[in-house]
């Protein structure tokens, strides 16, 4: 894998993290350097480690992982997305500090959900016999940069007076949309449509 190919893969993998970071910035509205570091570091770290984990596993458990990885990502994003949408309608100041997506379990869940595709990439590179060290480093660094950028872009969007509460609501919708896209890309809806036709037909 040459440098250009490695960068292309890294950018593609960073898109979900970028979108989630924007949604997180919208949710927070005010972003501190510490929050930026936590989110970018964890997203970048998980994005770098997942390909290594996938590469290490190789063909041994590939079929098993591919059966449930997309459902795991969808479940995590759905849970956090619904939570953000619910809190968009709660107006107390206490709520502003109750769910900081850059801390605790929520941060880990987001990091895992946005790095599932990187696990699959690691599996693929293992099959192709490609060394994982350089791709993992590039993938992690690119994700870190995209996450930091997305977080502050979301913060700027949330400050627009015309957005208000709708911006926070949109953040939750974005997360759920990403989860649905993951299911779509794994053919879940095609399978469901086929089953429906067979039952109705």
Swiss-Prot record:
It comes from the Bacteria. It is found in: Cell inner membrane. Pfam families: Mntp. InterPro entries: Mntp/YtaF, Put_MntP. The chain crosses the membrane at residues 6-26, 39-59, 105-125, 127-147, 169-189. Keywords: Cell inner membrane, Cell membrane, Ion transport, Manganese, Membrane, Transmembrane, Transmembrane helix, Transport. GO terms for cellular component: plasma membrane. One of its GO terms (molecular function) is manganese ion transmembrane transporter activity. It is a multi-pass membrane protein. The keyword Cell inner membrane applies. Probably functions as a manganese efflux pump. Belongs to the MntP (TC 9.B.29) family. This is Putative manganese efflux pump MntP. It comes from Nitratidesulfovibrio vulgaris (strain ATCC 29579 / DSM 644 / CCUG 34227 / NCIMB 8303 / VKM B-1760 / Hildenborough) (Desulfovibrio vulgaris).
